[in-house]
Amino acid sequence: MSHNMKGQKKRLAKAHKQNSRVPVWAIVKTNRKVVSHPRRRHWRRGSLDVK
């Protein structure tokens, strides 16, 4: 990833952080009613609109 602007790198980092799974404590607290979140993005299937 050469010649990336700092803003673009920052947005990619944010998208990377947002793509994490639901925390274990949330799954335990809700008695497994919440096990996944709908905004999860797969690296191959979902496209990322980062400018």
Curated annotation (Swiss-Prot):
Species name: Methanosarcina mazei (strain ATCC BAA-159 / DSM 3647 / Goe1 / Go1 / JCM 11833 / OCM 88)
Alphabetized NCBIfam families for the sequence: PRK01242.1
Residue numbers spanned by region Disordered: 1-23
GO MF terms, alphabetically ordered: structural constituent of ribosome
Compositional bias segments (type: Basic residues): 1-19
Protein name as it appears in the record: Large ribosomal subunit protein eL39
Disulfide bonds: none
Biological process, per Gene Ontology: translation
Similarity comment: Belongs to the eukaryotic ribosomal protein eL39 family.
Domain of life from the UniProt record: Archaea
Record flagged with keyword Hydrolase: no
One GO cellular component term noted in the UniProt record for this chain: ribonucleoprotein complex
InterPro entries: Ribosomal_eL39 (IPR000077), Ribosomal_eL39_CS (IPR020083), Ribosomal_eL39_dom_sf (IPR023626)
Keywords: Ribonucleoprotein, Ribosomal protein
